[in-house]
């Protein structure tokens, strides 16, 4: 990069590279690369790198910053070779330097390498993605209770496609450089544990290149839908976090709802992941109550 390039120019250029380059994450099986530099990185040459140990040439790496008056004004970059072994970066080398001539080498085409990204709020178990296009149907004034009733009607229609669409959504995530996620999985009487079982089956198939935590999520209200027994079954079945939802506007009993959520977490030694959408004073009260509960719990 020229020393007089503006940061905006650099970011504009590198932004075009992120999508393809992020796929070089060490845990992702798909990468845009070419054997021995014969084909350069582009979206039409997607391939799998199956070699356990290899060199990746022409990788654009951020190496530092240029400063003006003590303020970083632009990023310095350089093309280098990355040595990867068993899914981990083991060395950075001068570009196209291969100390071990027996190892295969690939050409990254000058794309910017970035750390993998994480999606920490996604619902892999229920999505329209991968199915026919549908327009948003949420009239003005729709409440969360209205959405719960609508979802209770739609879930049986979505459930046969859970695995197929979760696979496609994971493909989309990986294509944008995301290899780690936390999926909130419906646990309520309509779905039972079926969504959890379907999601676990998909994640078992994708574990080589995709890591995902599962939140057992009482989407229809922990108390409102009487989901505590199912939540406990979900924790026994391997969910990683105990989910929670608006304890006042949905469950109608802030302290009881939060106490139940925390008790499940304590009983199974798991963390909590709660979605609190309440913008009324009830939301502040819920936050304060959770802080107090955490502080007094050993």
Functional labels for PLM-detected ranges:
Residues 194-208, 224-298:
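Histidine/acidic residue-rich metal-binding segments in metalloenzymes
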Residues 87, 110, 121, 177, ...:
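Divalent metal-coordination and catalytic microenvironments
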Residues 145, 149-156, 164-194, 199, ...:
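Divalent metal-dependent hydrolysis catalytic cores, especially in the metallo-beta-lactamase
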Residues 114-132, 184-189, 214-222, 271-281, ...:
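N-terminal-biased segments
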Residues 128-162, 238-241, 286-298:
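Active-site gating loops and adjacent loop-to-helix segments of metal-dependent hydrolytic enzymes
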Residues 11, 132, 170-171:
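An N-terminally biased module of ancient metal coordination in phosphate/nucleic-acid-related enzymes
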Residues 6-25, 30-100:
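N-terminal metal-binding scaffold of metallo-dependent hydrolase/deaminase domains
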């Amino acid at each position: 990069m020229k020393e007089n390039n503006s940061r905006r120019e650099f970011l504009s250029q590198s932004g075009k590279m992120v999508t393809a380059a992020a796929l070089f994450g060490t845990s992702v099986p798909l990468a845009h690369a070419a054997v021995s530099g014969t084909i350069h990185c582009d979206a039409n040459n997607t391939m799998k790198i199956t070699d356990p140990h290899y060199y990746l040439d022409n990788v654009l790496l951020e190496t530092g910053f240029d400063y003006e008056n003590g303020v970083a004004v632009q990023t310095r970059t350089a093309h280098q070779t990355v040595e990867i072994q068993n899914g981990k970066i083991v060395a950075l080398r001068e570009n196209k330097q291969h100390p071990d001539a027996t190892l295969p080498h690939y050409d990254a085409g000058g794309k910017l390498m970035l750390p993998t990204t994480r999606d920490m709020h996604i619902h892999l178990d229920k999505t329209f993605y991968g199915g026919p296009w549908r327009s948003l149907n949420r009239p003005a004034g729709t409440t969360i209770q209205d959405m719960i009733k609508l979802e209770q009607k739609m879930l049986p229609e979505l459930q046969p496609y859970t695995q197929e669409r979760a696979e496609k959504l994971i493909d989309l995530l990986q294509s944008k450089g995301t290899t780690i996620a936390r999926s909130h999985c419906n646990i309520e009487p309509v779905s039972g544990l079926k969504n959890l079982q379907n999601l676990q089956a998909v994640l078992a198939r994708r574990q080589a290149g995709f890591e995902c935590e599962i939140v057992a999520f009482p989407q229809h209200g922990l108390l409102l839908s009487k989901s505590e027994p199912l939540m406990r079954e979900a924790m026994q079945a391997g969910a990683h976090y105990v989910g929670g939802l608006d304890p006042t506007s949905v469950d109608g009993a802030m302290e009881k709802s939060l106490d139940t959520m925390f008790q499940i977490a304590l009983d199974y030694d798991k963390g909590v992941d709660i979605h609190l959408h309440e913008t009324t004073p009830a939301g502040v009260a819920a936050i304060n109550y959770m802080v107090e509960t955490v502080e007094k719990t050993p």
